[in-house]
Each structure stands twice: as C-alpha cells, then as structure tokens.
Amino acid sequence: MPVRRGHVAPQNTFLGTIIRKFEGQNKKFIIANARVQNCAIIYCNDGFCEMTGFSRPDVMQKPCTCDFLHGPETKRHDIAQIAQALLGSEERKVEVTYYHKNGSTFICNTHIIPVKNQEGVAMMFIINFEYVTDEDNAASPERVNPILPVKSVNRKLFGFKFPGLRVLTYRKQSLPQEDPDVVVIDSSKHSDDSVAMKHFKSPTKESCSPSEADDTKALIQPSQCSPLVNISGPLDHSSPKRQWDRLYPDMLQSSSQLTHSRSRESLCSIRRASSVHDIEGFNVHPKNIFRDRHASEDNGRNVKGPFNHIKSSLLGSTSDSNLNKYSTINKIPQLTLNFSDVKTEKKNTSPPSSDKTIIAPKVKERTHNVTEKVTQVLSLGADVLPEYKLQTPRINKFTILHYSPFKAVWDWLILLLVIYTAIFTPYSAAFLLNDREEQKRRECGYSCSPLNVVDLIVDIMFIIDILINFRTTYVNQNEEVVSDPAKIAVHYFKGWFLIDMVAAIPFDLLIFGSGSDETTTLIGLLKTARLLRLVRVARKLDRYSEYGAAVLMLLMCIFALIAHWLACIWYAIGNVERPYLTDKIGWLDSLGTQIGKRYNDSDSSSGPSIKDKYVTALYFTFSSLTSVGFGNVSPNTNSEKIFSICVMLIGSLMYASIFGNVSAIIQRLYSGTARYHMQMLRVKEFIRFHQIPNPLRQRLEEYFQHAWTYTNGIDMNMVLKGFPECLQADICLHLNQTLLQNCKAFRGASKGCLRALAMKFKTTHAPPGDTLVHCGDVLTALYFLSRGSIEILKDDIVVAILGKNDIFGEMVHLYAKPGKSNADVRALTYCDLHKIQREDLLEVLDMYPEFSDHFLTNLELTFNLRHESAKSQSINDSEGDTCKLRRRRLSFESEGDKDFSKENSANDADDSTDTIRRYQSSKKHFEEKKSRSSSFISSIDDEQKPLFLGTVDSTPRMVKASRHHGEEAAPPSGRIHTDKRSHSCKDITDTHSWEREHARAQPEECSPSGLQRAAWGISETESDLTYGEVEQRLDLLQEQLNRLESQMTTDIQAILQLLQKQTTVVPPAYSMVTAGAEYQRPILRLLRTSHPRASIKTDRSFSPSSQCPEFLDLEKSKLKSKESLSSGKRLNTASEDNLTSLLKQDSDASSELDPRQRKSYLHPIRHPSLPDSSLSTVGILGLHRHVSDPGLPGK
C-alpha cells in the first residue's frame, strides 16, 4: 500500500480552530460575515444558544448586532459603539444589557474581534459574550473600552493604544505619517437624542500626564480641549453625486458628537477610526436620515473646526502609505446594517438608533495576525484567530515530512543497514570471535578489523536515525499530520524508541579492552541485540509489499536469512562441544576428516578454514529445511541431533507455508491491493480517454486515494448483502448510532423505527474544497453533518458555516415535490455526512405515524437550502398533480345517458318552430317555479351537511361563506363543471386559490371549525398533514366520488324523464340548472315532492309544443353541444349569444308587467356564471351546470 500520508490537502480549519480554542474555556460566541449585508451571523456555538435561549436556526442569518436580544433597557450608546467597531473593523469590548428569549435581562461584555485574510481585509467578526457579575460591574465603571493588556500603569495604557500620539509630541501641527486615520471628534453641544454618554469627564491635570496633554493638544488645538465641531455632511469621498446640504439642510444644525470616555484611551473624545469615513458613524440622531455612502458630493470639504486641519492634512499627505490608504476607500465593498427604532412600550423591540451604512474597510497595513491584546484577554494560543482561507498543514522548521523524498531515501538506507546487521551480526558472533581473532585484535587495536569499522559506522547511522525520528511527522488517529516536536517525541517514546536505542548501542566498544575470557561470549550475545532492528523491516512490510514480485523476493530472503542464522547456530554448537568430547565424533571433526584437515590440539590454526565451516553449516541447514538431508553431513552428538530435529520442524513449516502456498499467500496479502490497482487503473483510463485536464485529474486521483484509505477498499453495500436483513439493520444501527442518539429529531423513536431509519442512511465522505450541492440542484436528500465543517455560499459569498451535528437540506414533509437548492455547499475540511433520500424518509414516516409527528416537530434545519421561489410553485404543482390524479381516476362517461340525450334532442328539434309563440305563455309560471327553487335549495342545504363529513370537498365551504357575506361567490362555483367526459383541472385549481384568498380576507367570520377542516382535508398548517394522511384522504375521496358518480347517472336519467313528462311549463333559468357532481340525491327527492300527481294528471293534456320556446331551443341544442364538446370556447360564446337574445325578448315581453312581476320574472333568468350576476343568485351556488345538459343554449 502507499505511504499513509494523512490529511495533507489544504483545509480551511477556521471553524475547527475557533471551536477548539473557545469551547475549552466555555466561551459564548458567534461568527458573522463582514462581507455581506447586515453582517449576518453564519455560526453560533452551543454556549451562546444556552445563554440566550435561542436555537441555532433562530440565530442564523440575523444581524451580528443581535437586535433580537435588545430591549428597552439596552442603551443606544452601546449599540452605536458596537456598530462603530463593526464599521471600523476594530477590536472593542462593550458592556451591553441584553434580553433572554423569555424576556429576562442579563449584562454581558460584548467583545468584537475582526478576522482578516492574508491581504488585511476583514472577512469575519468573532463576537464573544461574557457574563458580567455585580462585582465586576461595580469594580469596572467603564462601559466602552478598547481591548488592552491588563496593566495598572496609566502611562502604559495610553501609550499602547495610541502609539502614533508619541510622534505628535514632536510634530504638533500634523497628523502622524504612520497612522493618518486618528481623528478627534468632540462637541460641547448635547442633545437628548444623542447616543453619547453625558457622564464622561474631560481630562484634567491630575488624570493626564504632560506627554498625554501634549498629545491631546496636538490633535484638537493648542488652546482648546473640547472644541465645537460641526459636521455639515458625512465625510466620505466615494461618489460625488449630490450636495448633502441641499438634501438635508437640517443636518447643518445638528453636530455629530462623541462625549468623553472615562477610559484613558478616549481622553478628550479621542478614538481611532479606520478612515475619515468613520466620522459619519458618530452621528446617530434618530430623526436624521442617513444616506448611502455613494450619495455624497462634498467629499468632506464642508468640515468645520479642527476637521479642516485634519482633512487638509490627510488630503494633502504625500506619503505613499497615506495615499494608499486614502485610495482604497473608493474600493470598499459595502455592507448595510439596519438598526430598528425602539418603541418603549414594547419590551422586546430594539432601542432607537439611526439607519446607517456599516462598511468593513480594507486596511492593508493593519496586521491580520493575532494581536497581543487579544491573546492576553482571551488567554488563547497564537492561532486563536486563523485566517479564513485554505491552509496547508503547518510544518515547523527543521521538521521532516514522513512522506518526503529524503525520508524515503533514508528509510531505504536504513533498511540496507538492517539487512547487513541481520547477516553479519550472527556471523561475527559465531565465527569470528574466537581466541585467535581476539588475540590479534588486542595486539593491533580496534581498527585492525575492517568489519569492526563497518559496525561502528552502522551504529553511528542508527543513532542518527533516532535523532531523525524525533523530527519526523506522523499521522494520528484523526488522519492529521502532526508536526509539533513535543508531540512527535512523546509518540516516539511510546513506540519504537526503546528498541531502536538498544539496537544502536555499540556494545563491543563498551567492553573493548577488558581482556577477560568471557569477552567473546558476552560480545556475541550483546551484539545479537542489533537483530531488533528487524522489527523495522516487519513494520514496513506493508509499505514494500505492494507488488507480487517483491513479496516473492521477500519470502526468499526470509528463508535464506533463517537458514543463515541456523547455520551460525549449527557451527556454534559444534565449536562449543568439540573441546569437551573425548571421542572426536562431532560434525567439525567429521568435516576435517572428510576434507583432510584434521584438528590438532597442539596447533590452534589446524582444522578446516572458516570458509569450509560456514559453507558446510549452511549446506546442512538448507538441506534440512527443504528435505530430510542427504547424510554426508550428519549430527552425531545429542546436542546436534536435537538441533537437527528443530531444524526439520522449522523447515517443514516454512516449506509448507511459504513454498507450497505462495499463490495463496499473494492472493491473501494483496487482494485489497489488487482491487486498489484495478480501480486506480480504471480511473486513469477514464482520465486518459476523456482527456481530463491536469488540475481536475489531480483532484480525482487524490480523492480516490483518500477514499480508499478511509474505507480501506471495503464496499459497504457488498458486505451487507451477504447478511440477513436483521443483521444488516443491527450493523447500520451501530454505524449510525452517534447520529441517532445526538439528533433531537430521532429521540423517542422506537427500536424498529430506528432500525428502519438506519437502513436508509448512507455515509458520504468529502475532502476539502469538494462541492456537495450546487446551486440549482434538486434537493433529493437530507444531510446530517457528523464530522468536519462546511460552508454555504450564495454568489460566492459565505452565508453560513456548519459544523458537527448540523442539518441542511429542505423540509421534505412540507412539499409534494423536491425543490431546488439556492446555494452551494462546499466542504472546508474532511467531512463525514449522513444523508437520507427524500422518498426513503417519507416512507419510514408513513410506516411509523406515531414517530412522524415527533420527528417533524423537532426537526430543525440549520440551513434551509430550498429556493424561495420554488415554494409557491410547489403548491401549484401539488394541486396540479392532484387534478391529474383525479382526472386519471375519475370517469363520468355514460353511454346510456348519451343515447338518451340524442333521442330527446331529435324529438325537440321537430317542435322548434313553435317555441317563440308559446314563450309568452310561460311567464305566469315563473313565480311558482321560483318558490319551488327556493325550497329545493333549502332541502339541499339541509341534506348536504352530514354527507361531506370525512370527504374532501370545497363546495359547501364556498356556499356557506357566500351565504354569510353575500359576496360574489358564483365564479368559482360556476367554473366547476361536472362534465362526464372531463373534469377541468384548471377550474379546481382556481377554486382552491379562491378559497385561500377568501379565507385570508375573512379569517374570523367564515373560517370553518376544526372538525370541518379535518373533514375537508384542510389543515391549520401545511406541516400538519403527513404523507400517509394525504393518501388515506385521497382514498376516501375516491370512494365518495365513485358513489356519487353512480348516483349522478341514475338521478340524471330520472330528471330527464320527469322534465319531459311534466305538464307545467318550466322557466328557462331553472331548466338550465342541474345539481353538481358532488351531491345529486336530494334533486330526485325534491322533484318527486314538488310535482304532485294531481298537477301532472291535470296538465297531462299539454303537448310538447306548448312548452316554453327557450326550453325547446335548449333541448334542440343538446345534441350540438355534445358534438362540439372539443371546442368549448366556441360553445360558450354561442351559448352567451343565445342567452343574450333571450334576455332581450324577455325584457320586451315583461314591459307590460308591473314592476313587482317584472322583478320576480327577471331574477331567475340570470345565470350565476355571468359577469353581471347579482347577489341574489347566491341561493343556487350549490348547483352546477352540465355542459351537455339540455338547459344550455346553443346553435
């Protein structure tokens, strides 16, 4: 496998560093973006939420001035000081009275700390909140103090804050060249609306040292300590557009002022502004209207008083630094912070303050590192305020990266030295350290033996390696590269230091010159401690065992090395035993006899040579390891035989495990490596085939390598497929237990519900800079961040930074369709995310309705990614889907009804010539039909109420609302046609939209009860309905519509039969109206009761030709209306024309009647769907027109 490099990609560790430093000291802080409007809050820690009572979703995107914490007791001066600190991007500490969410007050020190990037631009603000006790408040009367070191000497305090003032003691008439931004603002004119505090005292001789007085005089004027300064306009030179004096003449009479601070830093109202623009922020009169900085024309030329000197000095400065600062003002990006006015009678509103523009200026020469003041106040480390950017891991000086080329070369060198040690240490201990060699070494010294010199060099190299290990980085458990020398030393001491130290001790130097007889044995035993270096080889086997050829070579070398060690031991046994044997039967004596070099006790140099001894011993061990031996070199003594038995056992194990299973060993050791290389090869082929550019190619390879290291090449889905579902659920529950336990939305869920949820979760790993969600992507999942930090960007502007346990996505239960993302989500560090698909989550919630309500109530998204414009569109889309579903499921086609209508149309066409002559005879029946119609509608109202319980219908609600208010409710009712061929989806949508508008217009009078809302499927809020409830209500609606369809078919046939058999002449206005599709049964009941048999029998002699002309005309047009159903627009136009002509005839005929009869005659003929429908037609709102009914006029 490759070298474990750790997290070496550039990461934005800003959030992690801040949390690590602040959380350890129980800090309460928020982070705001200085480059967006209102300096919106993009992060708040848990301590701030506990202190204020607000949750993180409530605080996100709020202005960093914390207007939601303000109240009547919050002083406007404190708010202005905070705003001024934000305006000038300066550090400041303000004591402010805030309000909890429950309304209680608390006092805390608000510490504003700007965070700047490498260019010195204020990118963010860290605002820390500290509780102020009564003792602290009494001991510290200063309410507004810049952050200073904790010193008691006033001299040092003043000098630390204003180093530029020291220069003024020598240059009285000009501003310091280093910092031209120091300005003096004071005014003796106080107003009640001024933000300045009236209790600040002017400096006196007792409170100011001589140098301080000189500094003060140099800034404000030699003879004055508090001159009157009139500012006729804001001092900005951004965009000369209009004259401030012309727009706001009253501003000339009000001076901007800052009263004296009790602090030594603000003597004579001296404060440091980041630019001359900041003088504008001192005027906080609540009635003055501040304009944007781009609206200024005078460029500060109308400044009066000492500002003339300051302005001229600044504008006339020739210093490059001054001109650079002055020129950057025009390039300042603008941010607006709106401070709302307070109403004293309301408790939770903000104190009054002016609307002004707050801009975080770009001050290049200000240090962006941590100042001494911040570290002393917060007692934090040097990296408390890291730069907000991608930062590579910090490597200390003289620290070696563990994956650097130098370290790789050094490791190979040490490996060769270890191999040398493993070979020559046993050889020298067994063969070379005898009496003859020892005598020679005593005579000529240590340098006579070249092998000893090499051993000395090896020992020195091992000692150097120990020193290098103390400066070599390592990867911790969090996959982070550790470069701190102290941590490296601790890690090395706990690991391999002891082994390396023992192996590096030069024992032969320590015992050199002792001259004892035990020297040889002792040196031989101690030098074998160098074999501990072989542990390094075992430690690095995984690094060098990536290829199969290397494994084979390594196995061969291990086998040969073991044979070498055994040969040394075999010689040592024979050499030690030979002097004590009476019969020379040892293998050395046998070897001397075989080769003709016998041992002579009187001659120490007799016997076989060292070469003969070593080769023979090595031959014996190899033959014993690979087989049972050939017998030419045989063990004779008991010790030799016992050793031979051990060698045979070792040989059988090694032969069987290594040589007999080489292929199996390779497959077992390199199965993951083979998969890694196969996948890597696919990635490289993909890159080469599609010609991926180099930066993107590098990102692909780095991500693949890191993902492989993170998962170790394990495919979780493939592993889980081999287990039963019960074990899969348990494994998933274990993998996601941290999320399910820490997230509040999942608390209280049953074991089965948690197992079902765990099965749906997927874990995603993202490296730094990877974009998880792009703007405009469809939000198909809900994300839970378990490790790392991410940033959310809108138009490349950071709007939020999310950390551990944050949730982002959309509220899936509120919308029928997934929305689109309104921002980009990018990883700042290596992140682990748990995501669940939208459909999977809704499915689990549908299976566990008891958990659904708890989950939807406690689910709080830290950031909602759904696009705002998609919310209203999703409502219409869901209604459209409902209409399509109804149109697909419902069918009002009736073949028998069509045939029946065709026959009636044919019969009525024959009598069309007599319709006009008989029209006048039908007028006297209108009053009678009108009374019948009123009773008909009342009966429908009485019988409709119990029917609609448990169904989803909007008609009763519309009728009831119209009846109460007398509004023109006919259009929505008239639009809903109960055509048997189609059900207009657009009309249903219009009806729902009319209901929503009507409900908003009359929320109290016409709002139905909770039971009626539940019956109609209209919830109080959109989040009350779950997916399962909607499906259940749709099923009930489908059953009701099917039942109504069958009733409608039967009733329409009965109505048509009765209309042709009736003897009374039916007026045209009532023959055109039939019951709607929602409810049809009361019509038949009414018609049966409203036409007595007596009247039918009496008037049975009337022929069809005696009916009203309009009725016959409409009956004749029935067939044509069915044929022209596809052209609805043309049919409606023709119907309106015929109806208009009938109305004209009716008005001519009714001219002979008295006004009372004319009024009763004209009312029923007006149709509710006409634009000029009067309010008297509300009574027939419950009835709907059929396009194919015989009452519709047509050509």
From Swiss-Prot:
Catalytic activity line of the entry: K(+)(in) = K(+)(out)
Biased composition (Basic and acidic residues): 976-987
Domain PAS: 41-70
Cytoplasmic topological segments: 1-412, 471-494, 543-549, 663-1195
UniProt-annotated stretches for the region Disordered: 194-216, 894-914, 958-987, 1144-1174
Role this protein plays: Pore-forming (alpha) subunit of voltage-gated inwardly rectifying potassium channel. Exhibits faster activation and deactivation kinetics and slow inactivation at membrane potentials positive to 240 mV, resulting in the weakest inward rectification.
Protein name: Voltage-gated inwardly rectifying potassium channel KCNH7
Species per Swiss-Prot/TrEMBL record: Rattus norvegicus (Rat)
